[in-house]
Amino acid sequence: MQFVYSWKLEKGDRLPAGKRDDLALREKEREIKQRLEAELIPQGGEITVLELVKKYISLKTGVRQNTKTGYNFVLNIIKKEEFGKRQISSVRLSDAKLWLIKLQSDGRGYSTIHTVRGVVRPAFQMAVDDDWLHKNPFEFQLATVVVNDSVKREAITRKQERAFLNYIRESGCYKKYYDAIYILFKTGLRISEFVGLTLADIDLEHRKINVDHQLQRTMDMRYVIEEPKTSCGKRVIPMTDDVYVCFRRIIENRPRPKNEPMVDGKCGFLFLDQNGNPTVAMHWEHYFNHICTSYNKLYREQLPNITPHVCRHTFCSNMAKSGMNPKTLQYLMGHSDIGVTLNIYTHVQYDDVETEMKRVVNAE
């Protein structure tokens, strides 16, 4: 144990006769405090960035499968980076910024960097809360450091939707996907909800779709059933006449395997792959990609990148443009916050603005 002393308590105190002048005790206390705040507690500060993130993730129990996948994605990136080997006590604010800039220079997209920081920042905050660090070096606005070059997923126009669906329907190679893709455009289902649908979820008699779960596949190729994030994700969607016809065809043409695959007590999945397993989101991402690529090779007027999630955007946008009540649309989309429905999934283009202005002016 070390001690400090001074012949003066405060700076303005009188120095005793014969004693050498020195800093007052309160001044020395302030210096010591500043030095302690600048230093780091060694036992915690010696662990590496990778070890810190692993510890943080180990405490996140009971998270959804998508979240686990995201954690593993971030871990794999950090494992490949020299930054992951650094002791957390050596990481300063400028180091954190330079690392994220490096990730973008290496070709990582803004959304990937956003995901990485979304895990690393709370991990470092955990170190602060545990008194391993005094400051969180990742506590800054991401947009001030890296350029947001992400491409916003927009809803496609009705003309593009018709062209895409017509191409699929007339294609000898892709027409087997027509009914499913039509349903995605006309119901706004999440792809994980769609692939999770079973025969028991489709009520053809009353023309209803029961949505109360999602089908996911883990990194180790296990199939899992997950409930929606919130109670709003559980809903019953009415079928239009066209959607009813599509579902009826899908069920009539569905193969009957000798052994129905079962996932967490559910069986009778509408779509199976060549191995007899339920299709998952990745399958449909590939189908959409192949169709778009094929279309754009044939036609001069190119289609944008269309994905299952673009179908969901498009459904929401079309319903909003048609004047659907916002609360009804929120229910159909399964959103807990109507702000998500209105601000994220509703896309207004110039043609829509022009049409709406003409409608209002003519009504006067």
Regions found by a protein language model. Give the residues of each.
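N-terminal DNA-binding module of tyrosine recombinases/phage integrases
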Residues: 2-90, 94, 252-266
